Amino acid sequence: MTAKHDIAPPGAPPGAPPGAPAGPSTGRPSRRSRGLGTAAARLAFLGPGLGYLIVLLLVPLALVLSYTVFRRGRFGGVVYEWTLENFTRLFDPLYFDVVLSSVKTATLTTLAALLIGYPTAYVIAGLPRKWKTIALIAVVMPFWTNFLIRVYAWIILLSGPGLVNEALTGIGLIDKPLQLLYNQGTIVTGLLYSYLPLMILPLYAAIERLDPQLREASANLGARPARTFWSVTFPLTVPGVLTGCVFVFVPCLGNFVIPEILGGGRSIMVGNLIRDQFLKARDWPFGSTLALAVIAVLVVLLFLQAWASRVYGGTEGRRA
Amino acid sequence: MPRRRLIYVPFWATYVFLYTPIIVLVVMSFNAGKSPYVFEGLSLKWYGELAGNDTIRQGLVNTLIVAVGTTVLSTVLGTLLAVGMARHTRSRLLDALGLLPAVLPDLVLAIGLLVFYATIKMTLGLHSVILAHTVFGMAFVAAVVRTRLTHADTSLEEASRDLGASPLATFTRITLPTLAPGIAAGALLAFTLSIDEFVIAFFTAAPTEPTLPIVIYSMVRFGVTPEINALATILLAVSFTVIIVAQRMTRLTESLS
Amino acid sequence: MSRIRYTRHLPAATVAAGLVLALAACGGSSSTSADGAAPSAAAEQLNPNADLSKQSLTITIWDGYSPKDLADQVKKKLGFELKTAIHDTNETAMAKLTANADSGIDVAFVSGQYAQALNEQGLLEPLHSELIPNLANLYPEAAQLSFDKGNKFSVPYTWGTTGICYRTDLVKTPPTSWNDLLNPSADLKGKVTMMTTERWLALPALKQLGLSINTTDDKQLAQAKDLLLKAKQGGMLYDDTTFGAKLEKGEAALVEAWDGWCPTTNPKIKFVVPKEGSDLWSDTMVIMKTSKNKEAAHAFINYILDPAVHSWVGENILYKVPNKAAMDLLIKNNQDLLAKNTPLQMTPAELLKGESIVDLGEASTKYTRLATEISANQ
């Protein structure tokens, strides 16, 4: 779904995953001794892009923000009467629990992605150059076919007569097809499937940058491989881990398609609530308030990320 | 050493996980029968059906128009922005603004634009999707180009300026050619992001002009015919070709520069 | 373009009409008159002899709900271009029709209560019945639908009811009551589905309790909620669009379904209206006020009501049409189909026993909340 998070720049060199500059690992250009140019040049370069972002990004976000304190119009839109009702409603257990459980689902997916993504990235980073490229492209490849079609494929795989049940019955693990579709696990599977590469790419970038001599030094000093990993390798890759976690967590939290297609209407996430406020209930102010809650969660997350990368930052092995 | 091999388990699991659904899709697109579960023999009939499906064709045309429009707009604005941010300002705030579209959940951007278009009473159409896609397209182009700028050697630009060239001349003669591979990569990125983008298009497209992902979404909701599998297979094949070509091109441009 | 922006350039009378309209739109809760007559003050003068070939028409409709070659037919018979947009649910259509000043849609196909809501918002053009002579083909009952008595702003395209659709080979005792859906026998677990569209989600529970499907009473809705939550805990699945296909594949055994979506041409599948009663729904055609092709829009609706055209619906998608001439034609030409398809045999009198779903104004948020409570429950 979040196509914009989906794909690595095809021409970008390995080590520069999509949006990598968003991560903590890319600092400001270090060598910058020249002046900043004339005011006219500054305006010519920065003006169009910033103007565009102000009109089509900041103004819309400000509108959403301002809607949170108004009443809904009966048929969508907004009535300009002040109210704090939307915020009271946000803390209504009905909606707040959905927000909480969405955070839980997104966290679960992120952890699963980290667990499977870290070793994968680790192996890829150690491959010979040619295989490295192939392995990386293979991680990105699935993104090149439509997101919705890929999600749909999971219905075929997991349904009663589907491949997974066939396989499980075939090897004798079960004797009767399991109900694999339409539950929380299915949603996590779908989310994991959709965003796993967003975890692998920044992890790969972080691991690849490590100086192998560090590990050798640690081993030479008598550390066991496990100890080397936990006390040397892992801390150095924490910034990459954090970037990957943000990349996975963010699109998971706002998702509404996967719960809808793979959840069988039995569970919803905050994305569904927001979508429904705009497209079904036509309650734009409350939809905006829910969106604000999502933004709030993300701001907390980004602060955590900044804090953690500062704690682990400053160590060698990262590009300054 | 067993410990060493253990790490290969998640590695291979990742690829099995990523590719099983895709293999199923591709195989089933050649299925003679209608059932998504039982393979009843080889046939190209779903590709034929697909070719005759006007809704999908129209969606594809709309998607291509949007993607091309987005690419052009994003590339121009994104490149200028990247150069501007790297060479003409040191504002951290601007940095953050430039990256905001990349970290903002697409749903939030989508409803923001929906509200905005409704407020200014803009009639929706392909143009409204292009404007929306450019918001994130530009951010990604800027990000890719900046990566290149940061690594680029600035001495040529400085020399050009010291020799009295105008900022414009410096930009067109020196900066742009240096950045060309980055710009090309950014453009390709904007194009592919736009082609597969669903959520923002879903909120900002006119009902009369759905893009391909919107068409697919409504088809999936009504239960899928193997036509969808055929479509997926074709998209996959096209993407594969594009990747190969892109790889070749970057290698070519890199060896030239 | 917004009607209100127009008014600057129009004579005083129209300005006044426009103001009434604007007030009606902004007033919100102030009035929800049942006959919906208020906004029709702003009726426009239409030219019955307009050159249709200079117009073009955009409609929005459910996928597969009209003949594939409809555009060609219209071009040939009426002389203008027809463009078709697809919506998957009423809500999607409503979102598009209400979000912006001009959606680009001339004629929309939406269910009755949604037509009513659009009209209350002042978004619909009152029908000029003199431009739709084929209205005479409709059953007299078709003008009695409570969301729009007298067809002032909507023309029913199809009508029917909601019931239980089931596989005779997978369900041991044929269902007769909504309780058989809400509380199915243990062997059907994971094979029963309900619809999630708010009003149809509440319908089985409300009818089971002997209540009105238009109730706004909090206590009654709370009772319905309990029943629906129990059903969910019993393993209920939710499906608005693919339940027919699931029944045919055997992935589902018993589902809540609109009559026309129950694939009764399959000998193993049957449709029943539970004994507690059900609804009378109608999908209607409405003309948007923003349309710049209103003559073409009327001509289009008139064309649809032609018996030969309208009977396509019954023949191909097995929905009943409220068009007597078309149904007579259908019955004459399709004896086999009719014999196999019990829902198609229902008469207007039988249909009118069902309760019409009407728009509930502000109170409709109660149903939205109910639906959220059901889907958010784990």
For each feature predicted by the language model, list its residue ranges:
Chain C
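Mature extracytoplasmic/periplasmic domains
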Residues: 288-351
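A ligand-binding cleft/hinge motif common to bilobed small-molecule-binding domains
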Residues: 113-117, 248-249, 254-269
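Extracytoplasmic ligand-binding site segments that recognize negatively charged/polar headgroups
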Residues: 60-68, 104-105, 109-251
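Bacterial lipoprotein signal-peptidase II cleavage site
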Residues: 26-37
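Periplasmic-binding protein-like
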Residues: 160, 221-230, 267-291, 333-336
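Early extracytoplasmic/lumenal segment of secretory-pathway proteins
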Residues: 41-117
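Conserved C-terminal helix/tail region of periplasmic/extracytoplasmic solute-binding proteins
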Residues: 347-378
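C-terminal motif of bacterial Sec signal peptides marking the signal peptidase cleavage site
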Residues: 21-25
